């Protein structure tokens, strides 16, 4: 039976190192003798329920770890479930009861180190690169047991589309990118090309690939993986010359200009490209060469495939001028720099420089790297440099950090969300006004935040190594990943301020005030001239560089951007900080808030909404915008922006009283209701919060009562809420954040309960 181990509970590896006793680390381990017959039957029932209902909801409820924690804590839901017939007759006691049920359940889901575990999945191009890398390096069977393989195959089968392909995420149409990578993944894991049982997964996938032109129509990142495996030729790839890391700082584009994740990704890719590394051919590799193309492998003209991309993948088409630019880069890279004598001087020096950067970034992120997309490239680059070296072994030790097990199988996560989950979950707990009932939850959560703050900048000359300041920030994941984010830092500040106000006798040792100052300093440093807040690093403002992007399936990948949600969170966090510590950099904070407010107001859409970059989509964005505006003193009475936002939310409420937004809103950049305008509890919680923050209860509470009825009646017997469509997103890729169903539903109910209490009093 699979069990989730937290922090130092997990089996240790001599190549792991930690700065905070592995706080937040989440590792799945299989216990062959674990689980009672009842528990094992419960696991199989959960798998069957998911498989039977995946045509309706493709996101798993992520129940395995929750049930494990509830058993370990002997949690029983003793509060009777509330059912509402008439929304207009909801009482304070009804709302408080539903809130307490949900909060006590969710508190029981807290890990012993203070965070709330969760998978962060959905992208269907994350699994195969790890499998390919481990296959090439000969470590597949050392990392993957038979149980791992069984669960990974389960996930592949569960997420395959009816037409045989796989989409960018589990809810989207099939694309060459994910279909060709997952086909290779299945073959490496031992699935036969034609006779693989009733599912015929490989046969169906291969038909899709060949019907759409073959693997030469895969996008850039997929071509790189095909090339290192030896089932594609590097000459058919867009150039990724390692010399980019030698460009001077005054160059319009250099390593420091790049967006942090494309920088991380290109480091490993460019080293492998510069080396033209190809795995030693095996019988399987030779078979794949024949299976992936409609024509003989030896007859493919690779140079003509360089700019090819299947129309299903080409969400952001490239112009003739862009293709011409990349042809020029290819000519410079391969016909000049990579020819004697320059290859002996420039290329070799560039490769050494690239690996110095790879090692630096790996060390400063504890070999977690920026995220799942970059890690296998870094890991393979380290193996190519030295198969027996410690760098590669340190990478292997961190592979389990990316694995997640749920009812739908095993998948590799994009990254963890430990700190983000903790900050938002604690805000929910604090809003519930149940401090005495959940004191231990608050203490553990506060301790986790204190352990998770980054206390120093990256070692050495970090700017030379293309790393910016980090001191004072919180990451999305855990402290050891080392890449702080603005919104997560702001949300953590707000939590810590609330805890700072509590008596030490209740909450324990307080965070050093200087550490809060460090966090605020980090946020002030990040703000752009336009008032917006980027996520990770100061935005360079060179948005014209996006024209150079070689990536076909997503936009805005070259340089850091400003984001609405980050700006709203930062304003809310700094307003809270300013009230408690008015003497720390007051002018800079006031300036940041003023510029941030204008940035938010300028982004408002004609219908009163805001576009959300990190969630689905206009409902999510509108919540973070209104929350930031309201924190700074804007109200329905004095702010046209809030009035328009409230009207947008009222206009999109469905007949049931809830909200449900289609993920199509994100790529189309206009509000689209869910199919049939069906309610989603996450969207409903977010929209209800907008109305409550916007003072709707004082004008006409009926829409809020109707929304509350939806949430209260949606609550399950245990106190959980139903898992519906995925509500996380980045660009056009849906991400699975299962804890959102608890956080936003309970946060809305907490605000609603407080509003009812004020009406009663």
Curated annotation (Swiss-Prot):
Entries under CDD domains matching the protein: SQCY_1
Single GO cellular component term: lipid droplet
One example of a Gene Ontology biological process annotation: triterpenoid biosynthetic process
EC number(s) on file: 5.4.99.53
Pfam families linked to this entry: SQHop_cyclase_C (PF13243), SQHop_cyclase_N (PF13249)
Keyword Isomerase tagged: yes
Catalyses which reaction(s): (S)-2,3-epoxysqualene = marneral
Spans of repeat PFTB: 149-190, 516-568, 642-683
Active site residues per record: 487
Family: Belongs to the terpene cyclase/mutase family.
NCBIfam families recorded: squalene_cyclas (TIGR01787)
This protein's name: Marneral synthase
Protein source organism: Arabidopsis thaliana
């Amino acid at each position: 039976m699979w069990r989730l181990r937290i922090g130092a509970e997990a089996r240790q590896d001599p190549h792991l190192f930690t700065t905070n006793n592995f706080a937040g680390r989440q590792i799945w381990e299989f216990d062959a003798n674990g689980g009672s017959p009842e528990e094992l039957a419960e696991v199989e029932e959960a798998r069957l329920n998911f498989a039977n209902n995946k045509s309706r909801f493709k996101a798993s409820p992520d129940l395995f770890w929750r049930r494990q924690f509830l058993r370990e804590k002997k949690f029983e839901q003793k509060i009777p479930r509330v059912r509402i017939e008439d929304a207009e007759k909801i009482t304070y006691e009804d709302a408080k009861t539903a809130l307490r049920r949900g909060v006590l359940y969710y508190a029981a889901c807290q890990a012993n180190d203070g965070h709330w575990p969760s998978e962060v999945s959905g992208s269907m191009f994350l699994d195969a690169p790890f499998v390919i890398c481990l296959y090439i390096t000969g470590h597949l069977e050392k990392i993957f047991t038979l149980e791992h393989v069984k669960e990974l195959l389960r996930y592949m089968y569960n997420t395959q589309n009816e037409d045989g392909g796989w989409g960018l995420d589990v809810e989207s149409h099939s694309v060459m990118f994910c279909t060709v990578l997952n086909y290779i993944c299945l073959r490496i894991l031992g699935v036969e090309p034609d006779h693989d049982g009733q599912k015929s997964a490989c046969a169906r996938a291969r038909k899709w690939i060949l019907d759409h032109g073959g693997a030469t129509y895969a996008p850039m990142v997929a071509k790189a993986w095909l090339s290192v495996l030896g089932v594609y030729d590097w000459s058919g790839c867009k150039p990724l010359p390692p010399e980019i890391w030698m460009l001077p700082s005054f160059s319009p584009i250099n390593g420091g200009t790049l967006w942090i994740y494309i920088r991380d990704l290109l480091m490993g890719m460019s080293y492998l490209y510069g080396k033209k590394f190809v795995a030693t051919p095996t019988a399987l590799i030779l078979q794949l060469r024949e299976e992936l193309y409609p024509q003989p492998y030896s007859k493919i003209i690779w140079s003509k495939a360089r700019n090819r991309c299947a129309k299903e993948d080409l969400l952001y088409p490239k112009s003739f001028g862009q293709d011409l630019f990349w042809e020029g880069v290819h000519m410079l890279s391969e016909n000049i720099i990579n020819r004697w004598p320059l290859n002996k001087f420039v290329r070799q020096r560039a490769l050494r420089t690239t690996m110095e950067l790879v090692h630096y970034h790996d060390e400063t992120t504890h070999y977690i790297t920026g995220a799942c997309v970059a890690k296998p490239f870094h890991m393979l680059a380290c193996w190519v440099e030295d198969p027996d070296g410690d760098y590669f072994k340190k990478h292997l030790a961190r592979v389990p950090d990316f694995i997640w097990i749920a009812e739908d199988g095993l998948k590799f996560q994009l990254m963890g969300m430990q700190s983000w989950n903790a900050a938002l979950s604690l805000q929910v707990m604090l809003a519930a006004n149940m401090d005495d009932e959940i004191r231990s939850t608050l203490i553990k959560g506060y301790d986790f935040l204190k352990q998770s703050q980054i206390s120093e900048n990256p070692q050495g000359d970090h700017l030379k190594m293309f790393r910016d300041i980090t001191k004072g920030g919180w990451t999305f994941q855990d402290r050891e990943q080392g890449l702080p984010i603005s919104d997560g830092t702001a949300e953590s500040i707000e939590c810590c301020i609330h805890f700072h106000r509590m008596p030490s006798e209740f909450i324990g040792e307080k965070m050093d005030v200087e550490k809060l100052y460090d966090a605020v300093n980090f946020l002030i440093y990040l703000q752009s001239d336009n008032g917006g807040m980027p996520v990770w690093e100061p935005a360079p403002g060179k948005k014209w560089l996006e024209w150079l992007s070689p990536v076909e399936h997503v936009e805005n990948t070259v340089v850091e951007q400003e984001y609405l949600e980050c700006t709203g969170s930062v304003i809310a966090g700094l307003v809270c900080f300013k009230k408690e510590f008015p003497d720390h950099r007051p002018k800079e904070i006031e300036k940041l808030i003023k510029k941030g407010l204008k940035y938010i107001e300028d982004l408002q859409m004609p219908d009163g909404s805001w576009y959300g970059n990190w969630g689905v989509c206009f409902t999510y964005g509108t919540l973070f915008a209104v929350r930031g505006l309201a924190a700074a003193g804007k109200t329905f009475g004095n702010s046209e922006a809030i009035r328009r936002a409230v009207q947008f939310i009222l206009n999109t409420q469905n007949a049931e009283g809830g909200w449900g937004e289609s993920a199509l809103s994100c790529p189309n950049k206009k509000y689209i209701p869910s199919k049939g305008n069906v309610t989603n509890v996450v969207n409903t919680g977010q929209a209800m919060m907008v109305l409550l923050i916007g003072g709707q209860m004082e004008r006409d509470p009926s829409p809020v009562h109707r929304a509350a009825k939806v949430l209260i009646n949606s609550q399950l017997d245990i106190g959980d809420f139903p898992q519906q469509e995925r509500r996380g997103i980045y660009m056009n890729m849906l991400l699975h954040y299962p804890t959102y169903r608890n956080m936003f539903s309970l946060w809305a109910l907490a605000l609603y309960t407080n509003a009812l209490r004020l009406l009663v009093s």
